[in-house]
From Swiss-Prot:
This is Elongation factor Ts. It is found in: Cytoplasm. InterPro entries: EF-Ts_dimer_sf, Transl_elong_EFTs/EF1B, Transl_elong_EFTs/EF1B_dimer, Transl_elong_Ts_CS, UBA-like_sf. Residues 84-87 are annotated as: Involved in Mg(2+) ion dislocation from EF-Tu. GO terms for cellular component: cytoplasm. Disulfide bonds: none annotated. Associates with the EF-Tu.GDP complex and induces the exchange of GDP to GTP. It remains bound to the aminoacyl-tRNA.EF-Tu.GTP complex up to the GTP hydrolysis stage on the ribosome. One of its GO terms (molecular function) is translation elongation factor activity. Gene3D superfamilies: 1.10.286.20, DNA helicase RuvA subunit, C-terminal domain, Elongation factor Ts, dimerisation domain. Keywords: Cytoplasm, Elongation factor, Protein biosynthesis. Pfam families: EF_TS. Belongs to the EF-Ts family.
């Protein structure tokens, strides 16, 4: 029997696209015979997993949880993608997404790369995902990952329909007082898709771009109405600031109108209970990098 070395495993993986554990098993069964191992892999349909990686996987589900931590609580959300919603809603796929989440939590992962590197039984999440592709017959991948920490963390998982798994997960970290309105804030995040917590969190380049667009649009509108340059220079800045204010109300969580009572903002909810929102995250299936 030929020795099953790392180089041999790498060779067969590169030639078949199969996962590491599948290659090890095939080589063991074939007693180190590469040609026979490749036949075993083909027979089991594992090779197809590598070929599927070039196909887009933008359906799927999001597994989420809250665990106790040194800082109080930590919320985790992991998106697992498939090619079709048919696969995404199967109990086995949802169960597998949950196992990936469990592995991420055990590893205290903070990024997609750390999730993929996390231990999963006697292999890694990356290898487990590759093997799942063969099981489900589709390209399967870990998509987005989010993590929030604070004294209190609230998680809300939204389903498009009863038979489908969660397609949006919203998480928010608050202080203890803010916990009283954290659920309402999580609902708001899910429904309205805020991008930043406060206006100070808006990146400078984003704000600069918005200001430039607002200025150009305002100037063109005033010119089209026949306003003289002197008038434009006088009134345009106020109009631009108004448009930036509208931008903040649309994209900044604490400045958004509360969906259940538009007469108040989300920030008002926290003021009413003397609480503070610390951070939040929103993950929606298919909204990460297309692949």
């Amino acid at each position: 029997m030929a020795a099953i070395t790392a180089a041999l495993i790498k060779q067969v993986r590169e030639e078949t696209g199969a996962g590491m554990m599948d290659v090890k098993k095939a080589l063991t069964e074939a007693e180190g015979d590469v040609a026979r191992a490749k036949e075993i892999i083909r027979a089991k349909g594992i090779q197809a997993a590598g070929k599927r990686e070039g196909r887009k996987a933008q359906e799927g589900t999001i597994a989420s949880t809250v665990v106790e931590s040194a800082n109080g609580q930590t919320g985790y959300a992991v998106e697992l993608n498939s090619e079709t919603d048919f696969v995404a809603k199967t109990p086995k796929f949802v169960e597998f997404a949950g196992s990936v989440l469990d592995d991420a939590v055990k590893a205290e992962a903070s990024s997609v790369d750390e999730v993929l590197a996390a231990a999963s039984g006697d292999t890694t999440v990356k290898e487990a995902v590759e093997e799942a592709a063969a099981l489900f017959g589709e390209h399967v991948k870990v998509g987005q990952f989010a993590k929030v920490e604070g004294p209190h963390v609230e998680v809300y998982a939204h389903k498009k329909s009863a038979e489908m798994p969660p397609s949006i997960v919203a998480m928010i970290a608050t202080d203890e007082a803010g916990a009283a309105v954290a659920h309402e804030a999580a609902l708001q995040i899910s429904a309205m898709g805020a991008q930043w917590l406060t206006r100070e969190d808006v990146p400078a380049d984003v704000l600069e771009s918005e200001r430039r667009v607002a200025t150009e649009k305002t100037t063109e509108e005033l010119k089209s109405k026949g306003k003289p340059e002197a008038v434009i220079e006088k009134i345009a800045p106020k109009i631009v600031e108004g448009r930036l204010g509208a931008f903040y109300k649309e994209t900044v969580l604490l400045e958004q109108a509360y969906v259940k009572d538009p007469s108040k903002t989300v920030g008002d909810l926290f003021k009413e209970v003397g609480g503070t929102a610390l951070s939040f995250a929103r993950v929606e299936v298919g909204k990460g990098d297309a692949e």
